[in-house]
């Protein structure tokens, strides 16, 4: 079954220059899993006849049934490059065998957290684009994430069989399509990348360099310009050139590749390349890419699909393709598959592109270290990561948990960045909240076993050196979702992953049979472990809430909960959307609150953030961990804050990182530092449960204007200050025109021209609005982009399909928060209904609490 053993893999793991860690990323249904099959079959794990149909990496039953990838799966492949190909590799290498750790990731936007987890442990990405529908919204999202993590992309144009058989494009049109996709991808790379002067150098993709592949995953064939350049170099070589050395030959092939793309033309009359589109006698010349590459492919397709036997036989002989006896009797599509697969095998083309152009851990960790590691850039751990040193201290990042066949236990899945991880090694397990020098979120435990992940199987392995991807057994009890594993006692954490979506849709769950409650609680804990994104919360009313990224994500989570994690029947509520509370202008009075013993007074005001600041905090451009002066400068330059105020930010909230700020603009208050912690605690409490309906606050800046304190320390303890601070914060919100914010999806809808009207109808009913509409060049498809409130998105897909005759395909991504128009105090408005519903659901008193509860008189 497998052509190579664990021992062989283990031997090659030490050659860190010959390891490639890569993930396959793309828009939903552009053919990632199908393509991965051709790679897997090349490495001899599935029979080549079944490649393209097996979807080996879709390991779960529901993935096979729905034909979508839900969880990212990892697989290790072994590939050997020939002498000639080794000369194309520009980085250091060690022997001709390569170990490729491949992670197939989901394309569905609801699972984009899985993609983030996959990207963290890889250095390169194969971006798959369907050449018929082009670069879509999800392609852009995942590519942006990859570039933010400093991951080098190579491109694969998939589904060429559709372009040839369904759309029947001419060679020149097809070239233009490819050219446009390459341009689109490069625009994304240059927008989010660091430019040529950055640490990675130029990461733009270019067919001439061989970083773009073309082909069809379903039929199992693919090529880069390198394959054709080699054929033509061999064909045009004069008699005396047969003795070229490998290096000279590589040079010739690279020169040839430059002539095969772009505005270069070929004159068939004399076999010369020219740079002008017209020959000397005025004939229009064909483009080299069309004449020398697409033309032979078109001829093969044409001859076989029109059942011209003699012509087919001639072509097969000319292209020197050896068919099996059983393949010779086929005709039509099956024969086409067999011929193309023999002539341009996808596995070879892609694996060569991966080994030649994607970086090894040695290359990549040099420039990725500063993004990965939170600690100082010159301590032992950082040096170990930078040089990918097996003798350095162990540094390993766990990016997700993978459920095992044993109920309730998980493998910790991650990558070793420095040192060696081995069975029985005693390590420090550090969760995301660990800070060096403290004891919380830290465990000292031995690793029970190290294992190798092979898609549906796991293989035990003694030890794994740095640069590799590995699973650990026996760590799952100490980590929730992610964490750092190390042997270096002064190590800082590896940086937490930033998710591009946020969990905004929630359902309440309860056990159908109340006696099953303990099982439900246990199941929720396991669910929180197994999915990087999902949040499980217990409300004060005792309700169990699951929050996810969208309908599909929640559906899968609930199914997992019912069948795998809790194994009990479950009742679920309708999905509800979480809101945020904010203010729309500055407080109209200076708010005063007195402490319960009447000896301390706080004076505060609230005001809204300038546009864009809340988003900056979400992205981490502005954060609590930043250096103080740098942060003050940024706020002063970009948002015109007063520098003195910007330096006196006490904290961010909720949870110390959220998009609300508490600043101290008092002048000369005695004992202020003693109550700082208490005020901050009150602020965290108030921003987590706002005044309107106990939802999180967002985009509010609170200013402490003045504080009068009792001279005796005993009269100004936490019990006096914390509730006072909270009351004062609530008062300042209620006097500053409070508003509700709702989450908004960005919807991208692909559809034929004639049903665009139906889409507008559905969106208008759902309070959505279209902000961009464009035609995909060269196809009759339209792309409509619109904003749609998450609250209205339930059943949107079904509604859309029924109004467009099933021809429109929506993709929803959480995009931003937007203020719900209307005043929550006006009983007829939309926000006041939402507040009433939310308060009722949470079991709070009816109606927004009156201002008198919080505001005191002098």
From Swiss-Prot:
Cellular compartments per GO CC: aggresome; cytoplasm; cytosol; glutamatergic synapse; plasma membrane; postsynapse; ribonucleoprotein complex; ribosome
Enzyme class, spelled out: hydrolase
Domain tr-type G, first and last residues per copy: 17-362
The keyword Metal-binding appears for this protein: no
Entry-annotated residues carrying Phosphothreonine: 54, 57, 59, 435
Subcellular location: Cytoplasm; Nucleus
Modified residues (Diphthamide): 715
Pfam families from the UniProt entry: EFG_C (PF00679), EFG_III (PF14492), EFG_IV (PF03764), GTP_EFTU (PF00009), GTP_EFTU_D2 (PF03144)
Sites bearing Phosphoserine, chain numbering: 325, 502, 595
UniProt main location, coarse: cytoplasm
Residues modified to N6-acetyllysine: 235, 239, 272, 275, 439, 445, 619
Function description: Catalyzes the GTP-dependent ribosomal translocation step during translation elongation. During this step, the ribosome changes from the pre-translocational (PRE) to the post-translocational (POST) state as the newly formed A-site-bound peptidyl-tRNA and P-site-bound deacylated tRNA move to the P and E sites, respectively. Catalyzes the coordinated movement of the two tRNA molecules, the mRNA and conformational changes in the ribosome.
PANTHER family attached to this UniProt entry: ELONGATION FACTOR 2, TRANSLATION ELONGATION FACTOR-RELATED
Subunit structure: Binds to 80S ribosomes. Actively translating ribosomes show mutually exclusive binding of eIF5a (EIF5A or EIF5A2) and EEF2/eEF2. Interacts with SERBP1; interaction sequesters EEF2/eEF2 at the A-site of the ribosome, thereby blocking the interaction sites of the mRNA-tRNA complex, promoting ribosome stabilization and hibernation. Interacts with HABP4; interaction takes place at the A-site of hibernating ribosomes and promotes ribosome stabilization. Component of the mRNA surveillance SURF complex, at least composed of ERF1, ERF3 (ERF3A or ERF3B), EEF2, UPF1/RENT1, SMG1, SMG8 and SMG9.
Family note: Belongs to the TRAFAC class translation factor GTPase superfamily. Classic translation factor GTPase family. EF-G/EF-2 subfamily.
Name of this protein: Elongation factor 2
UniProt source species: Mus musculus
């Amino acid at each position: 079954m497998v052509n190579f053993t664990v021992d062989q893999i283990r031997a090659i793991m030490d050659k860190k220059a010959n390891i490639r860690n890569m993930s396959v990323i793309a828009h939903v249904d552009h053919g990632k899993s199908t393509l991965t099959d051709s790679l897997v079959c090349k490495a001899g794990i599935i029979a080549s006849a079944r490649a393209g149909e097996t979807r080996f990496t879709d390991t779960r039953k529901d993935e096979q049934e729905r034909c979508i990838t839900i969880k990212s799966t990892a697989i290790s492949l072994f590939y050997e490059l020939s002498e000639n190909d080794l000369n194309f590799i520009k980085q250091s290498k060690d022997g001709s065998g390569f170990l490729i750790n491949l992670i197939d990731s989901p394309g569905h936007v609801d699972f984009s957290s899985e993609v983030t987890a996959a990207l963290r442990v890889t250095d390169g990405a194969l971006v798959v684009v369907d050449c018929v529908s082009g670069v879509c919204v999800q392609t852009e999202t995942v590519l942006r994430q990859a570039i933010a993590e400093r991951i080098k992309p190579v491109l694969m144009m998939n589904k060429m069989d559709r372009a040839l058989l369904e759309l029947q494009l001419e060679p020149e049109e097809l070239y233009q399509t490819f050219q446009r996709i390459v341009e689109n991808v490069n625009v994304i790379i240059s927008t989010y990348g660091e430019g040529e002067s950055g640490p990675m150098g130029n990461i733009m993709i270019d067919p001439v360099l061989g970083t773009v592949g073309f082909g069809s995953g379903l039929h199992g064939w693919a090529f880069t310009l390198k394959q054709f350049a080699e054929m033509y170099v061999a064909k045009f070589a004069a008699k005396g050139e047969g003795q070229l050395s490998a290096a000279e030959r590589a040079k010739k092939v690279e020169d040839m590749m430059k002539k095969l793309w772009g505005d270069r033309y070929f004159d068939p009359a004399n076999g010369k390349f020219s740079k002008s589109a017209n020959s000397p006698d005025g004939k229009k010349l064909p483009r080299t890419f069309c004449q020398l590459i697409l033309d032979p492919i078109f001829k093969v397709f044409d001859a076989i699909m029109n059942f011209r036997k003699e012509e087919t036989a001639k072509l097969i002989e000319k292209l020197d393709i050896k068919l099996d006896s059983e393949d010779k009797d086929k005709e039509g599509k099956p024969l086409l598959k067999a011929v193309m697969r023999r002539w341009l095998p996808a596995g070879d083309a892609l694996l060569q592109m991966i080994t030649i152009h994607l970086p090894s851990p040695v290359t990549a960790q040099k420039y990725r270290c500063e993004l990965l590691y939170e600690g100082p850039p010159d301590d032992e751990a950082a040096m170990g990561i930078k040089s990918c040193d097996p003798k350095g201290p162990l540094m390993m990042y766990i990016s997700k948990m993978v459920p095992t066949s044993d109920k309730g236990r998980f493998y910790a899945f991650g990558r070793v960045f420095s040192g060696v991880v081995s069975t029985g090694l005693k390590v420090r397990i550090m969760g995301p909240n660990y800070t060096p020098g403290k004891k919380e979120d830290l465990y000292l435990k031995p690793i029970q076993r190290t294992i190798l992940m092979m898609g549906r199987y796991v293989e035990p392995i003694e030890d794994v050196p740095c640069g590799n991807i590995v699973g650990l057994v026996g760590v799952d009890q100490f980590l929730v979702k992610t964490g750092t594993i190390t042997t270096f006692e002064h190590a800082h954490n590896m940086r937490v992953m930033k998710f591009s979506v946020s969990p905004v849709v929630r359902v309440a769950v309860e056990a159908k049979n109340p006696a099953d409650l303990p099982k439900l609680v246990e199941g929720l804990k396991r669910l929180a472990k197994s999915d990087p994104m999902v949040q499980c919360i217990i409300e004060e009313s005792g309700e169990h809430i699951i929050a996810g990224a969208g309908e599909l994500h929640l559906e899968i989570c609930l199914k997992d909960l019912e069948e795998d994690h809790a194994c009990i029947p479950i009742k679920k509520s309708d999905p509800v959307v979480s809101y945020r509370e904010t203010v729309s202008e500055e407080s109209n009075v200076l708010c005063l609150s007195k402490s319960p013993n009447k000896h301390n007074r706080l004076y505060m005001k609230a005001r809204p953030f300038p546009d864009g600041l809340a988003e900056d905090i979400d992205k981490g451009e502005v954060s609590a961990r930043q250096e103080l002066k740098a942060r003050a400068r940024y706020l002063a330059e970009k948002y015109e804050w007063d520098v003195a105020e910007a330096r006196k930010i006490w904290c961010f909230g909720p949870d110390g990182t959220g998009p609300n700020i508490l600043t101290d603009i008092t002048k000369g208050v005695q004992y202020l530092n003693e109550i700082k912690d208490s005020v901050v605690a009150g602020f965290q409490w108030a921003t987590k449960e706002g005044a309107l309906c106990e939802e999180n606050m967002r985009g509010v800046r609170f200013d402490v204007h003045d504080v009068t304190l009792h001279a005796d320390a005993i009269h100004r303890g936490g019990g006096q200050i914390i509730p006072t601070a909270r009351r004062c914060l609530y008062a300042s919100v209620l006097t500053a025109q409070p508003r509700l914010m709702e989450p908004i999806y960005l919807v991208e809808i692909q559809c034929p021209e004639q049903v665009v009207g139906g889409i507008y109808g559905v969106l208008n009913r759902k309070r959505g609005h279209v902000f961009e509409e464009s035609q995909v060049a060269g196809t009759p498809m339209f792309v409509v982009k619109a904003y749609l409130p998450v609250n209205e998105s339930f059943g949107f897909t079904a509604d859309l399909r029924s109004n467009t005759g099933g021809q429109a395909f929506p993709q929803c991504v959480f995009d931003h928060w937007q203020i719900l128009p209307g005043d929550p105090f006006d009983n007829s408005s939309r926000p006041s209904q939402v507040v009433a519903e939310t308060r009722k659901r949470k079991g709070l008193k009816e109606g927004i609490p009156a201002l008198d509860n919080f505001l005191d008189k002098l």
